[in-house]
Amino acid sequence: EIISHVKSDTKKSKKYIISDLKSIEISNKIKRIFPESKQFFSKINESGDDTKTLVYDDLDSTFVKGKNIVFLETKEQGFVSNVSSILNSFINDTIKIELFTTNKNNAFEGANVSNNYLSNLKFQYASTNKKIDIVEDKSFIDKFISNYNYFPSKYSIRAYDITYDLLLRISNGDLNDENIFGIESQYFENKFRYKRSSSGSIDNIANYLIKHED
Protein backbone atom coordinates (compact mmCIF):
# COMPACT_ATOMS: atom_id res chain seq x y z
CA GLU A 1 0.00 0.00 0.00
CA ILE A 2 2.71 2.52 0.93
CA ILE A 3 4.65 1.66 -2.24
CA SER A 4 1.52 2.22 -4.33
CA HIS A 5 0.99 5.56 -2.61
CA VAL A 6 4.51 6.74 -3.44
CA LYS A 7 4.23 5.46 -7.01
CA SER A 8 0.98 7.38 -7.51
CA ASP A 9 2.54 10.67 -6.37
CA THR A 10 2.99 12.76 -9.52
CA LYS A 11 5.13 15.43 -7.85
CA LYS A 12 8.79 15.36 -8.84
CA SER A 13 10.98 13.90 -6.10
CA LYS A 14 14.26 12.16 -5.39
CA LYS A 15 14.07 8.82 -3.62
CA TYR A 16 16.41 7.19 -1.11
CA ILE A 17 16.42 3.94 0.87
CA ILE A 18 18.11 3.66 4.26
CA SER A 19 18.34 0.32 6.03
CA ASP A 20 20.39 -1.67 8.50
CA LEU A 21 22.08 -4.86 7.34
CA LYS A 22 19.20 -7.08 8.48
CA SER A 23 16.85 -5.22 6.14
CA ILE A 24 18.95 -5.35 2.96
CA GLU A 25 16.44 -7.66 1.27
CA ILE A 26 13.55 -5.21 1.56
CA SER A 27 15.88 -2.36 0.59
CA ASN A 28 16.75 -4.21 -2.60
CA LYS A 29 13.06 -4.88 -3.32
CA ILE A 30 12.30 -1.16 -3.06
CA LYS A 31 15.31 -0.42 -5.25
CA ARG A 32 13.89 -2.68 -7.95
CA ILE A 33 10.61 -0.76 -7.83
CA PHE A 34 12.37 2.62 -7.89
CA PRO A 35 15.57 1.96 -9.87
CA GLU A 36 16.60 5.61 -9.72
CA SER A 37 16.65 5.59 -5.91
CA LYS A 38 19.91 5.63 -3.93
CA GLN A 39 20.61 3.12 -1.16
CA PHE A 40 22.36 3.75 2.15
CA PHE A 41 23.22 1.11 4.73
CA SER A 42 24.17 1.26 8.40
CA LYS A 43 27.89 1.38 9.08
CA ILE A 44 30.04 -1.66 9.85
CA ASN A 45 32.77 -1.38 12.49
CA GLU A 46 36.29 -2.80 12.29
CA SER A 47 35.09 -6.09 13.77
CA GLY A 48 32.57 -6.49 10.95
CA ASP A 49 29.56 -5.82 13.18
CA ASP A 50 26.60 -3.69 12.18
CA THR A 51 26.70 -0.51 14.28
CA LYS A 52 23.09 0.25 13.30
CA THR A 53 24.05 3.90 12.86
CA LEU A 54 24.80 6.49 10.23
CA VAL A 55 26.64 9.77 10.66
CA TYR A 56 25.81 13.18 9.25
CA ASP A 57 28.60 12.98 6.66
CA ASP A 58 27.10 9.81 5.18
CA LEU A 59 24.15 11.85 3.92
CA ASP A 60 25.75 15.28 3.54
CA SER A 61 25.16 16.82 0.07
CA THR A 62 22.72 14.00 -0.71
CA PHE A 63 19.38 15.79 -0.66
CA VAL A 64 18.22 18.16 -3.38
CA LYS A 65 16.06 21.27 -3.37
CA GLY A 66 12.41 20.29 -3.42
CA LYS A 67 10.90 16.99 -2.35
CA ASN A 68 13.01 14.09 -1.10
CA ILE A 69 11.40 10.75 -0.23
CA VAL A 70 13.24 8.47 2.18
CA PHE A 71 12.33 4.86 2.98
CA LEU A 72 13.66 3.72 6.36
CA GLU A 73 13.69 -0.07 6.80
CA THR A 74 14.71 -1.43 10.21
CA LYS A 75 13.48 -3.09 13.39
CA GLU A 76 16.03 -1.29 15.56
CA GLN A 77 14.82 1.60 17.71
CA GLY A 78 18.31 3.07 17.96
CA PHE A 79 18.63 3.22 14.19
CA VAL A 80 15.25 4.95 13.84
CA SER A 81 16.31 7.50 16.45
CA ASN A 82 19.70 8.00 14.79
CA VAL A 83 18.41 8.36 11.22
CA SER A 84 15.37 10.52 12.02
CA SER A 85 17.62 12.93 13.93
CA ILE A 86 20.06 13.20 11.03
CA LEU A 87 17.30 13.61 8.44
CA ASN A 88 15.62 16.29 10.54
CA SER A 89 18.84 18.32 10.53
CA PHE A 90 18.76 18.57 6.72
CA ILE A 91 15.27 20.07 6.50
CA ASN A 92 15.19 23.76 5.60
CA ASP A 93 13.22 26.24 3.50
CA THR A 94 14.29 24.61 0.23
CA ILE A 95 14.93 20.96 1.15
CA LYS A 96 11.83 18.96 2.07
CA ILE A 97 12.15 15.40 3.35
CA GLU A 98 9.32 12.91 3.80
CA LEU A 99 9.96 9.66 5.66
CA PHE A 100 8.25 6.36 4.79
CA THR A 101 8.54 2.73 5.83
CA THR A 102 7.07 -0.46 4.39
CA ASN A 103 7.28 -2.14 7.81
CA LYS A 104 5.98 -0.03 10.68
CA ASN A 105 6.99 -1.78 13.91
CA ASN A 106 7.78 -1.02 17.55
CA ALA A 107 11.15 0.47 16.64
CA PHE A 108 9.35 3.59 15.42
CA GLU A 109 7.52 4.00 18.75
CA GLY A 110 10.41 3.75 21.21
CA ALA A 111 11.09 6.25 23.96
CA ASN A 112 14.28 7.34 22.18
CA VAL A 113 12.44 8.23 18.98
CA SER A 114 11.39 11.88 18.73
CA ASN A 115 7.79 12.37 17.64
CA ASN A 116 8.72 15.94 16.75
CA TYR A 117 11.26 14.65 14.25
CA LEU A 118 8.74 12.19 12.81
CA SER A 119 6.21 15.01 12.44
CA ASN A 120 8.77 17.27 10.78
CA LEU A 121 9.53 14.42 8.38
CA LYS A 122 5.81 13.79 7.75
CA PHE A 123 6.40 10.13 8.60
CA GLN A 124 4.00 7.87 6.69
CA TYR A 125 3.16 4.18 6.77
CA ALA A 126 0.33 1.75 6.06
CA SER A 127 -1.68 0.33 8.95
CA THR A 128 -4.80 -1.79 9.35
CA ASN A 129 -5.89 0.40 12.26
CA LYS A 130 -5.93 4.01 13.44
CA LYS A 131 -6.61 5.72 16.75
CA ILE A 132 -10.22 6.23 17.72
CA ASP A 133 -11.55 9.78 17.36
CA ILE A 134 -12.49 10.73 20.93
CA VAL A 135 -14.70 13.58 19.68
CA GLU A 136 -16.48 11.93 16.77
CA ASP A 137 -16.85 8.60 18.58
CA LYS A 138 -17.65 10.06 22.01
CA SER A 139 -21.02 8.28 22.22
CA PHE A 140 -19.42 4.84 21.79
CA ILE A 141 -16.64 5.64 24.28
CA ASP A 142 -19.06 6.95 26.91
CA LYS A 143 -21.28 3.88 26.58
CA PHE A 144 -18.27 1.55 26.84
CA ILE A 145 -17.01 3.31 29.98
CA SER A 146 -20.51 3.21 31.47
CA ASN A 147 -20.67 -0.57 30.94
CA TYR A 148 -17.11 -1.58 31.86
CA ASN A 149 -15.73 1.33 33.94
CA TYR A 150 -12.58 1.79 31.85
CA PHE A 151 -11.56 3.42 28.57
CA PRO A 152 -11.71 0.97 25.66
CA SER A 153 -8.29 -0.44 24.75
CA LYS A 154 -7.23 -1.05 21.15
CA TYR A 155 -7.90 -4.76 21.73
CA SER A 156 -11.46 -4.09 22.93
CA ILE A 157 -12.15 -1.84 19.97
CA ARG A 158 -10.65 -4.30 17.51
CA ALA A 159 -12.80 -7.10 18.93
CA TYR A 160 -15.88 -4.90 18.56
CA ASP A 161 -14.97 -3.83 15.02
CA ILE A 162 -14.25 -7.38 13.83
CA THR A 163 -17.43 -8.79 15.37
CA TYR A 164 -19.58 -6.01 13.95
CA ASP A 165 -17.97 -6.36 10.53
CA LEU A 166 -18.49 -10.13 10.39
CA LEU A 167 -22.11 -9.85 11.51
CA LEU A 168 -22.82 -7.31 8.76
CA ARG A 169 -21.14 -9.46 6.12
CA ILE A 170 -23.02 -12.59 7.25
CA SER A 171 -26.32 -10.70 7.16
CA ASN A 172 -25.62 -9.73 3.55
CA GLY A 173 -24.78 -13.17 2.21
CA ASP A 174 -22.33 -16.06 2.23
CA LEU A 175 -18.90 -15.20 3.66
CA ASN A 176 -17.37 -17.44 0.99
CA ASP A 177 -18.76 -15.12 -1.68
CA GLU A 178 -15.88 -12.94 -2.92
CA ASN A 179 -18.38 -10.15 -3.57
CA ILE A 180 -19.06 -10.11 0.18
CA PHE A 181 -15.61 -10.39 1.73
CA GLY A 182 -14.03 -8.22 -0.99
CA ILE A 183 -16.03 -5.15 0.10
CA GLU A 184 -14.01 -2.60 2.08
CA SER A 185 -15.46 -1.39 5.39
CA GLN A 186 -14.18 0.67 8.31
CA TYR A 187 -15.34 1.30 11.85
CA PHE A 188 -13.89 2.97 14.95
CA GLU A 189 -10.24 1.99 14.58
CA ASN A 190 -10.09 -0.75 11.98
CA LYS A 191 -10.56 -1.25 8.26
CA PHE A 192 -11.41 -4.53 6.55
CA ARG A 193 -11.18 -5.91 3.02
CA TYR A 194 -10.57 -9.62 2.67
CA LYS A 195 -8.83 -11.64 -0.01
CA ARG A 196 -8.32 -15.38 -0.26
CA SER A 197 -4.63 -16.29 -0.34
CA SER A 198 -3.05 -19.02 -2.45
CA SER A 199 -3.03 -21.25 0.66
CA GLY A 200 -6.79 -20.83 1.08
CA SER A 201 -6.80 -18.49 4.08
CA ILE A 202 -8.82 -15.27 4.04
CA ASP A 203 -6.54 -12.32 4.80
CA ASN A 204 -7.39 -8.74 5.67
CA ILE A 205 -5.64 -6.54 3.08
CA ALA A 206 -7.23 -3.18 3.92
CA ASN A 207 -4.97 -0.37 5.12
CA TYR A 208 -5.06 3.20 6.33
CA LEU A 209 -2.31 5.56 5.26
CA ILE A 210 -1.09 7.09 8.53
CA LYS A 211 0.80 10.37 8.40
CA HIS A 212 2.50 12.18 11.29
CA GLU A 213 1.82 15.89 11.16
CA ASP A 214 2.17 18.86 13.52
How would you name each of these model-derived features?
Residues E1-D214:
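Extracytosolic ligand-binding ectodomains
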